[in-house]
Amino acid sequence: MIVNEQLAIDHGLKKDEYKKICDLLKRVPNITELGIFSAMWNEHCSYKSSRFHLKNLPTKGKNVIQGPGENAGVIDIGDDDAIVFKIESHNHPSFIEPYQGAATGVGGIMRDVFTMGARPIANLNSIHFGSPQHKKTKNLLRGVVHGIGGYGNCMGVPTIAGQTSFDESYNGNILVNAMTLGHVKKDKIFYSKAAGLGKPVIYVGSKTGRDGIHGASMASASFDDKIEEKKPTVQVGDPFTEKLLLEACLELMAGDSIIAIQDMGAAGLTSSSIEMASKGNLGIEINLSKVPCREANMSPYEIMLSESQERMLIVLENGKEEMAKKIFDKWNLDFAVIGQTTKSKKIELYFNEEKVADIPVNTLVENSPMYDRKWKKAKLPKRIKVDKEQFKTLKVKNVLNKILSNPNVCSKEWIWQQYDHTVMGDTIQKPGGDAGVVRVHGTNKAVAASVDSSAVYCWAHPLSGGKQIVCESWRNLISVGAKPIAITNCLNFGSPENEENMGEFVECVQGLGEASAYLEFPVVSGNVSFYNQTKDIGIKPTPAIGGVGLIKDYQNMVTMDLKEADNILLVIGKTEGHLDQSLFARDILNEKNGPPPEINLFNEKNNGETILKLINKKFIKSAHDVSLGGIITALSKMCIKGKKGATLKKSNYLINQFEYLFGEDQGRYIIEISKDDLENATKILQENSVHFDELGLVNEDGLIIDDKTKVSIDDLIKSHTNWLTNYMEN
């Protein structure tokens, strides 16, 4: 095949990028080399439009063992224990083929974690779909949920938390972000940096097929009218093989034979071999004729770019090949010595005794493009002027019913009941709470994790939205009694070639960085997914934040369910009734303008740290952060979980009742405290200058909002739980 500029463009490269390749090589690349460059230089693998801005994120902290740059981030949780975690996107494949796209997204992120020596202990996900009225939404949701459950359940890893949202901006591009946590001892962490010369390079796992070729390139482009033609680029997963691969790798890792290990994810054998060589500042020579293939007559181009799943690349110590082979034979997995490390600092590929590629590693990595793209700064929208006369026509009970049954608020039990959330026996807080919690096996420690995003806030003002979503993650961890330690992010945006989209990305990252730095909540891993658009219609900016925190004694964990009648309910944080960009404004007033609520980072940190003090003194019986839908929505969920009611104090309505109940001011929590502990608890709040108000009392009767408004617990449950089940089953 003749390689020329047009063929390079067909591979997703720009004209100037193709010229740069020819200049670096001092010749025209052959077809295999062109394929390798197209994979390594695409947006998905090279981060060419985002690296310039991501370098400013805070990535260090006293608990950080490994930050961005490896397969996953690693944090120290004490006693020689570490948690490995990361979130990644599988958006484009999941829109084309929802079951396999979601399944292989889960499989890929689990491999990232166990590649580093950690046994996966928990999965989470953040999934976003178009309008419920859109013709594709229901089938896409069903396929994605089945794919996530099908893979995670077969692997025997619990899915402990997640987020699901609906918005018309996802009609043409759904988002599927998968997150995994793993546990490892600090002295058994493995890395992908190759070292030593003449070391054997080993291929293990499944055979290589033609599935997923150009998967990474497809994830670096917008959709058009030919979406169906892209189905062959979607990988096909086999969780049972991955389970075997997990156990085989962990068995091999128990010894001292592994120098470096890398899973074959995006761009397959291409990215895994090049990343190992680049980090080790050496070369790798591979004989592609030795790669186990499941299809006949595969070319070097196909072998290098295949994204067949459940495969690993390992650099071993010399003389350990037979021992390693016995392990993988025992687990019925392919094992092949396909090459060796060299001093050439090149990727050299052979096929049928012919050299088919010869590329200096630095041309693929250090010399890959990096763009400081043009971007537009977003203006902070003006506050909306609400005509409060229209409130007179509204009834609180009717509004609450509508808010609780909103697709973005309602119970997602239909989804998470399809996931095994108790397998492994260490889940101590299941989905549906502020965060999922798993015990660190054999210890009193527990790890809490949540995943959050707020596309509406980020769309209204990206800088504020970026801050808010980090703070939301922080509050969710605080609410279960966990000290927040670190985050991973999945940054989902439209085309970076559009100045407005790029501006959304830049300012969201700035906001994210500011909040992370202030809260001492560093970013240890992540992923960028651009080109989430069909033709020129892009998604709302959707950064998803996966937060991880530590509970030193799992018996101090807190849940959101109300516990006992006559206990006191306090609102922590000041309530000013911010309705702009609230669910009330959008759903009830049909008002979509205005700025998101203001973020006060001092209050966020101070409020959260003070609540942890109260939790550690066992003053707090239940807690829940206040977010979408405001105070009354948060309180309703606490009532539903505990099957208890609450009576609100009438004196709260110093501002308009609807502003008080449904405003989305940030930095707030509802906490339940016994009357006996109230004096001591409020003393701590006052000593730490934390604003609080008495919200009311827990009761057994229902939610009593005022003299005219009482909602039974059964009605709350019905409003909150029925929508999704009815939508999916009718």
From Swiss-Prot:
Provenance organism: Pelagibacter ubique (strain HTCC1062)
Subunit structure: Monomer. Part of the FGAM synthase complex composed of 1 PurL, 1 PurQ and 2 PurS subunits.
Main localisation: cytoplasm
Catalytic activity: N(2)-formyl-N(1)-(5-phospho-beta-D-ribosyl)glycinamide + L-glutamine + ATP + H2O = 2-formamido-N(1)-(5-O-phospho-beta-D-ribosyl)acetamidine + L-glutamate + ADP + phosphate + H(+)
Cellular component per GO, a single term: cytoplasm
Active site: 44, 90 (proton acceptor)
GO MF term list: ATP binding; magnesium ion binding; phosphoribosylformylglycinamidine synthase activity
Root EC class: ligase
Pathway: Purine metabolism; IMP biosynthesis via de novo pathway; 5-amino-1-(5-phospho-D-ribosyl)imidazole from N(2)-formyl-N(1)-(5-phospho-D-ribosyl)glycinamide: step 1/2
Assigned EC number: 6.3.5.3
Record-stated family: Belongs to the FGAMS family.
Chain sites annotated for binding Mg(2+) 1: 88, 527
Purpose: Part of the phosphoribosylformylglycinamidine synthase complex involved in the purines biosynthetic pathway. Catalyzes the ATP-dependent conversion of formylglycinamide ribonucleotide (FGAR) and glutamine to yield formylglycinamidine ribonucleotide (FGAM) and glutamate. The FGAM synthase complex is composed of three subunits. PurQ produces an ammonia molecule by converting glutamine to glutamate. PurL transfers the ammonia molecule to FGAR to form FGAM in an ATP-dependent manner.
Pfam families, per database record: AIRS (PF00586), AIRS_C (PF02769), FGAR-AT_linker (PF18072)
Keywords: ATP-binding, Cytoplasm, Ligase, Magnesium, Metal-binding, Nucleotide-binding, Purine biosynthesis
Entry binding sites for substrate: 89-92, 111, 235, 307-309, 529
Localisation per UniProt entry: Cytoplasm
Protein residues bound to Mg(2+) 2: 112, 263
GO biological process: 'de novo' IMP biosynthetic process
Protein name per its UniProtKB record: Phosphoribosylformylglycinamidine synthase subunit PurL
Residues annotated for ATP binding in this entry: 47, 86, 489, 526
SUPFAM superfamilies: PurM C-terminal domain-like (SSF56042), PurM N-terminal domain-like (SSF55326)
